[in-house]
Amino acid sequence: MEQHGTNEGALWGGRFSGGPSEAMFALSVSTHFDWVLAPYDVLASKAHAKVLHQAELLSDEDLATMLAGLDQLGKDVADGAFGPLPSDEDVHGAMERGLIDRVGPEVGGRLRAGRSRNDQVATLFRMWVRDAVRDIALGTTELVDALSAQAKAHADAIMPGKTHFQAAQPVLLAHQLLAHAQPLLRDIDRIRDLDKRLAVSPYGSGALAGSSLKLNPEAIAEELGFDSAADNSIDATSSRDFASETAFVLAQLAVDMSRLAEEIIAWCTPEFGYITLSDSWSTGSSIMPQKKNPDVAELTRGKSGRLIGNLTGLLATLKAQPLAYNRDLQEDKEPIVDSVAQLNLLLPAMTGLVSTLTFNTERMRELAPAGFTLATDLAEWMVRQGVPFREAHEASGACVRIAESRGVDLIDLTDEELSGVDARLTPEVREVLTIDGAVASRATRGGTAGVRVAEQRARVDAASTAHAEWARAGVRR
């Protein structure tokens, strides 16, 4: 390759007699994934120019020229008129080239004073992540809202609740749907907590030791929407725990979506028959005409593994790096950008899928008592009559054994069979051997009784609204 000067898409060159080999450049180039930082490069460069002016390193005229050039560069990036060239090493070199093209090397070449790619990229990446996770949070609230809307539409529907994937106790369908909304809300809580650590600006840290040019990192941090400037320049330029934490939060969100997806996949099978998928959110088979496949749910389940891989790969990259900056850290962006991209595909698709599900509530109600799911109610009825739970548990289990041997439900046992198990099992026990009674009786906070589930839904809706407001507010107002 020809001489690789600092005005040709790279930010270094004077110390070298020639440019890198083709293989070296191919390994080093990063514009194919770091170009997402270009709009943030403009914002940070404008803030940096103002600080250079305050430090009397830029004249009034040069500042005005530079800001105008950066504004034009930002517009050209936004509308696609300016982009990276094959000779650009990274987004930073490309953007400097673009600025110099617009304002000339005398003014454009002054912008780099007091900053390094090390503090620059750490700052821009944080800015991008802060915006990206707000979009993810907003999309997550929409999925929560879809679950809540289905819960409201089926407030009285009863279904089999399961543990170990076996029949356990009857619950409200709304209760089950809101049980998927809760972890999604916690995922947004994690995003908001993560943002506290993202909101620290590395700008002004230089390569690792800070700057001798009397710059003002706090002013840049404030203009860019950060809460503070970094306390330690070595840490600020070389740490990527914010990236691995982001990867974890996004992977956890994907895992929570995958659990919902798994239930949808099971529920739409003929064996369950709980739901029917909308044609708009399912696919067919190339050979079997009857098929209606839950591809949205399956892709959600599959892509969750991809996000877990992004997390583990990033952790492996970070685990043994000495201080301060190392080029390994170029590998921090692709896994995060990919995880964000996958969630931006999955969230609207899962929201559409959930909001258009048709529930077969009669089928769910029919199966709710199957598997002797009222056995606990029988035992707790005995407890209310003063029987120790250990004895009540034994008696209820004996009733299940008899009913199972006869192929009937608990309520179908005769009075003689009940009293034969335990004389304290009087005919009045039949009052609790209904799925409606079982559901209504579980009225503790968080329980499946209708009144409690309505309270849960109200809290879910309030939390979702608050999270959406936070996400829409943005970082830089």
From Swiss-Prot:
Q: Specify the signal sequence span.
A: none
GO-annotated molecular function? argininosuccinate lyase activity
Matching entries from Pfam families are given as:
ASL_C2 (PF14698), Lyase_1 (PF00206)
The answer on whether this UniProt entry bears the keyword Amino-acid biosynthesis reads yes
What domain of life is recorded for the organism? Bacteria
Main localization of the protein described in the UniProt heading: cytoplasm
S-S pairs: none
Q: What class of enzyme is it?
A: lyase
Protein name, please?
Argininosuccinate lyase
- UniProt source species: Corynebacterium glutamicum (strain R)
